[in-house]
Regions:
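Conserved N-terminal structural module of periplasmic/extracytoplasmic solute-binding proteins
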Residues: 1-95, 157-167
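Helix-loop-helix "hinge/cap" segment bordering the ligand-binding cleft or interdomain interface
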Residues: 45, 87, 92-95, 101-179
Length: 179
């Protein structure tokens, strides 16, 4: 709602130390992150909130384990947790994260808006009644770390032989960033 005002509420966000540069400033030359930073500032001003980023560690698994331990031991003051999907998803089963579809969390969220990655979020749900992870324009890491390899079938065949060998390499676990 346009008149929504959180009256200076502090939003505590757990984040890996390695990613604070993306969220804490607009400098650094990355146009996407500069836009995210500016958009977050607009939201903060409109809703009258301040973000406090709580840095944990560099390691994805250490970050998730610390955050989940804090939450499950009632030591947590986090309002939002930024985790890597690979390590974070399993922790929803441990009861560490709130179901965003519960009214107390979702009453101001319109998950039908185009800035949410609805297909991505749908793929991370356990049922139609649960949602533990959000993804959208505010966190472009979801798409910035996605990768795909395209190759010209005919050129590959001419220089390296059977293109199906590439698929077999992947299927057999031999694919690396160097190979």
């Amino acid at each position: 709602p346009d008149d929504l005002d959180f009256k200076g509420t502090k939003l505590s966000i757990a984040i890996r130390d390695k990613y604070t540069e993306y969220y804490l400033g607009e400098e650094g030359g990355d146009l996407i992150w500069a836009a995210v930073y500016k958009a977050n500032q607009v939201v903060d001003e409109r809703l009258h909130i301040t973000r406090e980023y709580v840095k944990t560690s560099e390691s994805s698994v250490d970050h998730v384990n610390k955050v989940v331990t804090d939450i499950l031991s009632n030591e947590s003051t986090y309002d939002l947790v930024l985790v890597d999907q690979f390590y974070g998803c399993a922790k929803a089963l441990d009861g560490a994260f709130a179901n965003i579809k519960d009214e107390q969390y979702s009453k101001y969220l319109d998950l039908e808006k185009d800035y949410w990655y609805s297909d991505y979020m749908s793929n991370l749900t356990l049922s139609e009644d649960t949602l533990y992870f959000l993804g959208g324009d505010a966190s472009p890491t979801i798409i910035s770390w996605t990768s795909c390899t395209f190759f010209n079938w005919d050129l590959y065949d001419s220089y390296y032989g059977d293109p199906n060998a590439l698929f077999r390499l992947v299927d057999n676990g031999g694919w690396t960033i160097d190979k």
